Structure formats: structure tokens, C-alpha cells
């Protein structure tokens, strides 16, 4: 079976950026996901648990790394080493990560290290409109109402 890796600098980024697309592919690919950081759990919920619940909707394997948000630049080499070793073990066909046009500092670091480690895979960047000053796309993937409903269910897992 072919493999997809979806990477979230923060626990809700996958759902927002490519949740419907991953739902579309859930029966065709093994989907692995990585949550790199999370905000501290708030009184209304636990973002790490919410991430696991959301990813269960697309039957994804989940890894949470537990890095601190907004200082990923201090962990660049660790991230690169982690991604490099993961790529050697798994040889993913498609990688979803933040777009190269994303201006959030954590998203930029993740994109850059993903690009270095997985340069022989297809890398598709997802966009979060509030982080991008421009909209530039090379790939559109059609999703249906069922995929969109699944994305909404994934987002509904979050109380935080």
C-alpha cells in the first residue's frame, strides 16, 4: 500500500489544511501523521487528545513529538534528523506539510526541514489563509461532500 505522511506544526494544522483531502485518500493510502507542537492544555480541553481523536476519523497512525511552539528554530537539527530517519524507514509517496508561502515561523521551519529530508517524495503544501499573504497553488484535489463533512467532524474534535 502506498503511504502518505501529513505533518502538523501545531495539532490542528492538518485538519484545517488538508483534512478533507486526507479523508478522500484514507482507503487508498496508509496515512501517518505527526503533531510537532501543541499549546498548553486549556481548561476546556486537551489539544493532544483532540488531535488523536481527529486523526482517528481518517484512520491515521499518530505520532506526537511534544516540541515547544514558536521556538522550533532551536530544534531544527533534531527535526531534520527525525524526518531523515523516518524517510529512510518508510519511503513515503506523498508528504503534506505547510506551504512554502506560509509566514508562521513554526510552519516555515517545518516546511524547510521536510523539503530537505523528503526531497525525493512528492511534497504538497497545505495553506492556512491567515498565514499566507499570497495564494499560489499548483495542485487542486477535488473533494466531495462526504470528505468535507469528515473535515468538519475532525475540527469538531477540538474544544481548545
Regions found by a protein language model. Name each.
Residues 18-19, 44-47, 108, 134-139:
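Short aromatic-enriched loop/helix-cap "lid" or pocket-rim segments at secondary-structure transitions
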Residues 37, 68, 100-101, 129-132, ...:
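Short, flexible active-site-adjacent loop segments at beta-strand->alpha-helix junctions, enriched
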Amino acid at each position: 500500500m502506498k503511504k502518505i505522511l501529513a505533518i502538523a506544526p501545531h495539532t490542528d494544522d492538518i485538519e484545517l489544511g488538508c483534512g478533507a483531502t486526507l479523508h478522500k485518500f484514507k482507503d487508498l493510502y496508509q496515512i501517518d501523521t505527526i503533531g510537532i507542537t501543541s499549546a498548553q492544555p486549556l481548561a476546556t480541553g486537551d489539544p493532544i487528545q483532540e488531535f488523536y481523536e481527529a486523526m482517528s476519523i481518517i484512520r491515521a497512525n499518530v505520532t506526537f513529538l511534544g516540541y515547544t511552539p514558536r521556538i522550533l528554530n532551536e530544534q531544527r537539527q533534531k527535526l531534520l534528523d527525525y524526518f531523515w530517519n523516518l524517510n529512510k524507514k518508510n519511503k513515503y509517496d506523498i508528504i503534506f506539510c505547510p506551504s512554502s508561502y506560509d509566514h508562521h515561523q513554526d510552519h516555515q521551519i517545518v516546511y524547510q526541514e521536510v523539503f530537505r529530508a523528503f526531497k525525493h517524495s512528492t511534497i504538497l503544501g497545505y495553506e492556512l489563509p491567515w498565514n499566507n499573504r499570497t495564494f499560489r497553488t499548483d495542485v487542486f484535489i477535488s473533494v466531495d461532500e462526504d470528505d468535507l463533512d469528515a473535515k468538519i467532524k475532525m475540527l469538531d474534535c477540538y474544544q481548545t
